[in-house]
């Protein structure tokens, strides 16, 4: 197994076997391997050692949430998980304040309310789609505004992993000549 807390030790076992001609598969129980996943480091290490890596398209919460959001999908930015540090998270969100593309984030249930509060404070009350437990039995998409989502999840405890799809900043239209 290869995960955040054992990746150095596991890589020391996996890489020599791959260099010796064996094959391996990187599988994740949390969506597409290597996307907001420690497998990203293993793919990089393989590349550094000249090991060919192939990907078989699989579940992607980002694309699933975008497709189900009802928000613009032509151009988007995927920001992964925000920092757990309050200061770093707010600084990150400040860089997105004027982003015109649709914004996609991952969030854990225990941090959802705090993140929605920060989104509201920094981005304002934009449209948002919250995808929960995508492609699973209890799949749910909530299409609302950031403020309404904040009220909803303050009142009911969030469960499951979330993908947040947020409308980008409005494009300023200059004067017509």
Question: What role is predicted for each listed range?
Answer:
Residues 1-8, 59, 80-85, 133-136:
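Short, acidic/turn-prone active-site loops that include or flank metal/cofactor-
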Residues 32, 59, 82, 86, ...:
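Conserved phosphate/pyrophosphate-binding and hydrolysis machinery centered on Walker-type P-loop NTPases
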Residues 16-19, 42-44, 69-74, 122-123, ...:
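Short, hinge-like loop/turn segments at secondary-structure boundaries
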Residues 12, 37, 65-67, 89-91, ...:
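Short, well-ordered secondary-structure micro-motifs
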Residues 41-99:
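Class I SAM-dependent methyltransferase SAM-binding "motif I" and its flanking Rossmann-like core
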Residues 19-24, 102-177:
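A contiguous loop/helix-start segment that scaffolds small-molecule binding in enzyme catalytic cores
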Residues 28, 55-58, 105, 130:
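General beta-strand structural signal in soluble alpha/beta enzymes
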């Amino acid at each position: 197994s290869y995960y955040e807390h054992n990746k150095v030790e596991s890589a020391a076992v996996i890489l020599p076997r791959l260099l010796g001609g064996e094959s391996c598969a990187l599988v994740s129980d949390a969506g597409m391997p290597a996307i907001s996943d420690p497998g990203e480091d293993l793919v990089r290490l393989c590349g550094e050692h000249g090991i060919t890596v192939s990907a078989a398209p699989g579940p992607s919460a980002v694309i699933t949430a975008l497709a189900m959001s009802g928000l613009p999908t032509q151009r988007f930015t995927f920001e992964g998980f925000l920092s757990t540090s309050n200061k770093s998270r707010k600084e990150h969100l400040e860089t997105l304040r004027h982003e015109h593309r649709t914004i996609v984030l991952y969030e854990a249930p225990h941090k959802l309310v705090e993140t929605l509060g920060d989104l509201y404070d920094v981005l304002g009350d934009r449209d948002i789609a919250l995808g929960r437990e995508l492609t699973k039995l209890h799949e749910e998409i909530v299409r609302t505004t950031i403020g309404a989502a904040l009220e909803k999840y303050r009142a009911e405890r969030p469960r499951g992993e979330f993908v947040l799809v947020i409308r980008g900043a409005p494009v300023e239209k200059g004067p017509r000549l």
